[in-house]
């Protein structure tokens, strides 16, 4: 959680770890967000997604620079929903910057989420924990 607490705090969010160790549980209080230009020490789709989603509601432009481009599923989804977002690559295999503008009016779309065993595992585990339950997971490889 520490990896997302830091940039969100830089944006003006009020987030603290209940036990002071940077781990959940967290205390999150409302705050006015402002855009930042964040350079991530590692390529992480999770950290990048968190910052870009917060950037939708921030005042001013928000960008995330990674040493190499991580998975871009959030950027593709936000662009499809109408967000003003772009990714700039320097060279193949080198740093990439994703930039989003605030105050977007997003438009819902019909989407299909690809099968992913790591996501399905939670539902499978839940089905195993509940006696006499049934679960059907399709198209997961």
Please provide the spans of the model-predicted regions.
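Structural preference for solvent-exposed beta-strand-turn elements
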Residues: 1-141
């Amino acid at each position: 959680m520490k990896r997302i607490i830091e940039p969100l705090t830089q944006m003006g969010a009020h987030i603290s770890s209940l036990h002071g160790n940077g781990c959940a549980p967290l205390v999150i209080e409302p705050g006015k967000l402002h855009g930042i230009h964040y350079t991530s020490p590692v390529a992480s789709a999770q950290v990048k997604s968190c910052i870009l989603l917060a950037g939708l509601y921030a005042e001013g432009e928000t960008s995330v620079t990674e040493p190499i481009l991580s998975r871009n599923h959030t950027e593709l989804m936000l662009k499809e929903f109408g967000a003003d977002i772009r990714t700039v690559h320097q060279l193949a295999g080198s740093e990439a910057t994703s930039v989003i503008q605030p105050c977007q009016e997003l438009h819902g779309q019909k989407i299909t989420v690809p099968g992913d065993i790591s996501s399905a595992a939670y539902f499978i585990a839940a089905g195993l924990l509940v006696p006499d339950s049934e679960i059907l997971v399709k198209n997961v490889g």
